Amino acid sequence: MRNITTSAYTPTEFTIENISDTVAKISAWPFEIGYGITLAHPLRRLLYTSTIGYAPTAIHIDGVAHEFDSMRGMLEDVALFIINLKKLRFKIKGESNKEIVEFSFKGSKEIYGKDLNNDQVEVVNKDAYLATINEDAELKFTLIVEKGIGYVPSEEIKELINDPKFIALDAFFTPVREATYDIEKVLFEDNPDYEKVVLTVTTDGQITPNEAFQNALEAMYKQLSVFDKITNVRSVIKNQATSNELENTKLLQNITDLNLSARSYNCLEKAGVVYIGELALMSVSELAGLKNLGKKSLDEIKNIMESIGFPVGTSKLSDNKEILKNKIAELKAQNEG
């Protein structure tokens, strides 16, 4: 039987299951009936539309006038070459939002994504096929790769570039290949009328599913912040965050609950790290700087923290950092006493 309440229950459980480097299942529960889809559906849309990625936006091929042209010595015509090119998933290596990259191939060979890796860009699907040229061919092309979100049609790209030498391309920036959700019934406090949201996120390798999910959450918070100018909801929520709420998470549990390897645990123990929350409060560089903590141990700790929903250096604690620090200090003082 459901009791009469004056506010909806706030979910406390969150897990991330990394199925592979590009696929993850993200679960949260328990939600009140109807709340699951209310949150899951917009998050799914934001995963597709607001996740930053990279895409080729325009190309100039030496000796080619337009996309319906052909090129001597290349098996593919230009249209098929461009189709193959758009299947390649690029990453810009530096901090730039745009790179103009030149490529040159000569002699008989098959060209794959890995052949386009250089100091400026990386192709994450290295084995993707691009073209075949014979011994008489000389393929030279200049590619514009840009950072963006969502999808931008070639007509708009053409206006932005405004250079007749370049062929504008449809730009598919989103690195999210698939985002789906399931709403499951879950038992909570002997009541079956609660929901569990399970999001499955698949990316193309430009970023991890966890990064894509974090981007979607940030986009949602930013869009909703416009209402805070009137309602001041954020301040109210922040003031309601107490140490009692933190106790419902794993952050105040001992690091022994992480089931770390002996080497990793000993390094943390010698550094004075007692609680899981201390790891969440650290940046990756701070964790890596702990004495005798090797790369293998660093990766193990990062992966485990990510799997429980509190990655090392997480931004999720921005509003509760001081509360968590004070609570951990209080617990340590009690233990020493």
From Swiss-Prot:
SUPFAM superfamilies from the entry? C-terminal domain of RNA polymerase alpha subunit (SSF47789), Insert subdomain of RNA polymerase alpha subunit (SSF56553), RBP11-like subunits of RNA polymerase (SSF55257)
The Swiss-Prot or TrEMBL record annotates one GO molecular function as: DNA binding
Listed GO CC annotations = cytoplasm; DNA-directed RNA polymerase complex
InterPro entries in alphabetical order: DNA-dir_RNA_pol_insert, DNA-dir_RNA_pol_RpoA/D/Rpb3, DNA-dir_RpoA, RBP11-like, RNAP_asu_C, RNApol_insert_sf
Extract the ranges annotated as region (Alpha N-terminal domain (alpha-NTD)).
Answer: 1-231
Q: Which UniProt keywords apply?
A: DNA-directed RNA polymerase, Nucleotidyltransferase, Transcription, Transferase
Q: Kindly provide the name given to this protein in its UniProt entry.
A: DNA-directed RNA polymerase subunit alpha
Q: Which gene encodes it?
A: rpoA
